[in-house]
């Protein structure tokens, strides 16, 4: 699990940035925790915003291909396995088949599929994400597409090989490429939902995104509070001990 996600799940500490542990208290059942936070997220658009106030929240709501465990090691998340070509240019990820998208009410919307990663990257490029610099020169064809020299996104080095296999082709070998997959710029998004929300996708409204992670954001009131509840249908729910987290400004 990612460090902040793992800490939320175990209730030991809530990570730096949004989650501050000093003022925390637990209920007698130890499944509800209350803390304070210092800064409101000004967006939930995890694909275009490169700010800690967004990523500290999103990391507990949306999963990517890989994540860091409590020791900083890269471990599987949505990708249950992966391979790297001999020349170090092609990374192929096999997705778990039990990961689902849920709306803010916890209702299942769709399965998480390889095309969601392709859709996410195209959106990142089209919207000129704040975090593009992390990957623009890494993925084959992405720089040309972003600059407008290439109009066909299918020429960019990402593809859904099948429903549960996504593949990235790099411009050069990057031994640290897998670490980049933990950044929300490479997270998936459901295309149908994205289109339905339009410019409202990722606004400061819990219903503006879909969830595939351990928590759902039940409420967010500026300079007041944020409330998270456990996603009861999360594929790794047995490792999430907290049922409810309330952060107070």
Where are these regions (language model features)?
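Bacterial N-terminal signal peptides that target proteins for export
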Residues: 1-8
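C-terminal motif of bacterial Sec signal peptides marking the signal peptidase cleavage site
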Residues: 19-22
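Bacterial signal peptide processing site
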Residues: 24-26
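N-terminal lobe/hinge region of extracytoplasmic solute-binding protein
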Residues: 36-86, 210
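Sec-exported extracytoplasmic/periplasmic mature domains
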Residues: 66, 70, 97-100, 122-129, ...
